[in-house]
């Protein structure tokens, strides 16, 4: 427990120092831009094209999935009993994500959410899932969102979200739906942290 708490203190300090040197928006644009570059390079090398699917179907399915993911996330943060893993997710939001996202503007939330949805879905659902399969791609997605002690439960939750986004990509026959679901979910999560998280997450 002590080691876990140390990680949860050291990691936010590192993140805060990084954000002071580079704005979070700039980091997001660079990081997600690299993911897009890797995804398109891999796609070009493999001779495969990205399939985005129908617009109406993608939008509707994406919004519905975002609503489900957002509801589950809110339940974990506010309503769920303190089962194993739940307290660590709540601490991660309070001690890491609140300092990171707590002062974002509406424009920053929209842009960061959009580039995250595009970059991560192109790579994980557009490249890794066709190459490795649904489960391995979802596991890697979860691992990519872990950052030290105390983040295992959060990584498992993100892995589940990755699986749902992967199933959504298959069911909707394209990447548009998971991109929308991912972006809308991220926007809702950051908005919650920005305007309501300080009072609820503990």
Where are these regions (language model features)?
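Cytosolic-side membrane-entry/anchor segment at the start of a transmembrane helix
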Residues: 12-37
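Extreme N-terminal basic, low-complexity initiation segments
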Residues: 2-4
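A periodicity- and composition-biased signal for non-globular, repetitive helical segments
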Residues: 10-11, 38, 131, 188
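Short amphipathic alpha-helical "recognition" segments used for binding
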Residues: 8, 36, 124-125
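Hydrophobic alpha-helical membrane segments, chiefly transmembrane helices and signal peptide h-regions
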Residues: 32-38, 65, 185
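Juxtamembrane helix-loop-helix connectors linking adjacent transmembrane helices
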Residues: 6-11, 27, 41-116, 199-202
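Transmembrane helix-loop-helix hairpins at the membrane interface
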Residues: 95-202
């Amino acid at each position: 427990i002590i080691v876990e708490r140390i990680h949860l203190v050291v990691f936010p300090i590192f993140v805060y120092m990084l954000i002071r040197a580079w704005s979070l928006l700039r980091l997001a644009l660079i990081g997600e831009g690299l993911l897009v570059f890797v995804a398109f390079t891999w796609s070009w090398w493999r001779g495969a094209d990205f399939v985005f699917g129908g617009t109406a179907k993608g939008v509707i399915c994406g919004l519905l999935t975002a609503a489900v993911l957002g509801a589950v996330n809110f339940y974990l943060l506010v309503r769920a009993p303190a089962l194993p893993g739940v307290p660590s997710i709540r601490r991660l939001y309070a001690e890491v994500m609140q300092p990171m996202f707590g002062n974002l503007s509406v424009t920053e939330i929209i842009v960061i959410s959009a580039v995250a949805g595009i970059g991560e879905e192109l790579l994980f659902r557009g490249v890794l899932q066709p190459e490795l399969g649904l489960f391995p791609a979802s596991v890697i997605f979860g691992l990519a969102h872990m950052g030290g002690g105390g983040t295992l439960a959060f990584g498992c939750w993100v892995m589940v979200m990755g699986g749902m986004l992967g199933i959504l990509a298959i069911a909707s026959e394209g990447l548009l739906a998971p991109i929308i679901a991912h972006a809308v979910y991220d926007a809702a999560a950051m908005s919650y942290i920005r305007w309501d998280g300080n009072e609820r997450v503990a």
